[in-house]
Amino acid sequence: MAALSKSIPHNCYEIGHTWNPSCRVSFLQITWGALEESLRIYAPLYLIAAVLRKRKLEYYLYKLLPEILQSASFLTANGALYITFFCVLRKILGKFYSWTPGFGAALPASYVAILIERKSRRGLLTIYMANLATETLFRMGVARGTITTLRNGEVLLFCITAAMYMFFFRCKDGLKGFTFSALRFIVGKEEIPTHSYSPETAYAKVEQKREKHRGTTRAMSLIALVRSLVDSICKHGPRHRCCKHYEDNCISYCIKGFIRMFSVGYLIQCCLRIPSAFRHLFTEPSRLLSLFYNKENFQLGAFLGSFVSIYKGTSCFLRWIRNLDDELHAIVAGFLAGVSMMFYKSTTISMYLASKLVETMYFKGIEAGKVPYFPQADTIIYSISTAICFHAAVMEVQNLRPSYWKFLLRLTKGRFALMNRKALDVFGTGASREFHNFIPRLDPRYTVVTPELPIDFS
C-alpha cells in the first residue's frame, strides 16, 4: 500500500510526452502515427484474408474498406486515448502515483477502444491480450521472487493442454469450428470416433486402386514400382481391429504421420523466413541458402512430426493393450505427445493454447448451465489485460514480451521509448533499466521539477 501511495510531482510533459510540451500536439502526433501504422497492418491482413476465404466481389466493393477502417480506428484509439488519459489523470490527481502512468491511463483507453472494434474480433483480441498479460504477470512474479520458475514448465503446460484438447477432439461435439478442423488436419480423421469410412468402403477403395493398377502394369515406371512396394508393405502388417487406418498398419501409420507433419512444419518455418531472406537478397545472397537449412526449420518440423507420431503410436498401443477404442486414450496419448515441444520450446504457444482451452471449457460450462454468462466479459478482460501490458511497458519493460514492445514502438513511431523513466525509478520497478539511463531534454519553462538536462536556448 505504501508503494501505491508514493507519488512524484512531475507533470505529464516531464514524464510522458517529453518530445513536446503541448498535450494537444502530442495527442495529434500519436494519433497520426498510430493511424498510419494501423492501416499498414490491417490493409494487407484483411486483403489476404479475403482472398483466402474466396470472398465475392460485393465484399471487396462494400465491406472490405469499412472493416479495415474500423479495425484501424480501434488500434489508433487505443494509442491516442492512452496519451489522453495519461494527461487527464495527471491534471485531476495533481501528481503521478505508481499506477497512473501505466495501468490507470491504459484501462479506460483500452475499454473505449475495444468498443470500436467489431464484436466478431473481440474474442480473438481478448485471448491474445489475456495470454500476453498472464505471461507478463508471471515474469513480474519471477522478477520479484514471488514465483519460482519450473524447468521446462512450458513443455509441461503444453502436455496438459494437449491432453485436454485431444480428449475433447475424440469426444462427440467436444470441439467445433477452426479448432476441430486444425486438429483433424494435424492428427488425421482416422482418430475421430465417428470416422466416415467403414472397413468395407475403405477396402472397396483399395480394390478399385488395385484394378486400375493391373490395367497400367506395362507402363509402370520405377517410381510407381517403388510406390507399389511401399503400399504393399504398409497394408500387410499389424493393425488392431479397432484401428481405423485401414490402408496402413500401425507402424507405417505412425511413420507416415511423422513425415507428413515434419514436412508441413519445415515448410511453414521456411515461408516465415522468406520476407527477411529476400530483403537481404542483393546485399547478402548467402542468406537465401540459409532459408532451407536453418535450424528452426528442422526444429518446428521435428516438433509437429513427433507430436503426431507419438500421439498415433500411443493410441494404437493402447488399443492393442486394452483391446478397445476409448476417448480416454486421447488424454494419455495427448500428454505424451506434448513432450515433443522439447524440440521447439515456446512459452507463447503454450500460453496461447492454454488460454484457448480455458475459453473452450468456459463456453462448455455455459452450454451445460454450470457457469454463468457475463455479457461484457471479453471487453473487461481485454481492458484489464491491455492495461497490465501497458503498465509493464512503462514501469518494467524488461518483463514485457519483446515482440509486443517492438509493436508499441512501431505504433507510436518510437515515442514510447522517450518517456522519462529515470524519474519513475523511485517506484522501485527498475523502469529505466533497459534504457541506458536515458534522460530527456526538457524545456524548463514547462516543468514542475528542475530538469536534469534542460534545453539550452542560448
UniProtKB/Swiss-Prot annotation:
It is found in: Mitochondrion membrane; Peroxisome membrane. Pfam families: Tim17 (PF02466), TMEM135_C_rich (PF15982). GO terms for biological process: alpha-linolenic acid metabolic process; fatty acid derivative biosynthetic process; fatty acid derivative transport; long-chain fatty acid biosynthetic process; long-chain fatty acid transport; mitochondrion organization; peroxisome organization; regulation of mitochondrial fission. The chain crosses the membrane at residues 68-88, 96-116, 149-169, 298-318, 331-351, 377-397. GO terms for cellular component: lipid droplet; mitochondrial membrane; mitochondrion; peroxisomal membrane; peroxisome. Keywords: Membrane, Mitochondrion, Peroxisome, Transmembrane, Transmembrane helix. InterPro entries: Tmem135, TMEM135_N. It is a multi-pass membrane protein. One of its GO terms (molecular function) is lipid transporter activity. Its main location: mitochondrion. Involved in mitochondrial metabolism by regulating the balance between mitochondrial fusion and fission. May act as a regulator of mitochondrial fission that promotes DNM1L-dependent fission through activation of DNM1L. May be involved in peroxisome organization. Belongs to the TMEM135 family. PANTHER family: TRANSMEMBRANE PROTEIN 135, TRANSMEMBRANE PROTEIN 135-RELATED. This is Transmembrane protein 135. It comes from Rattus norvegicus.
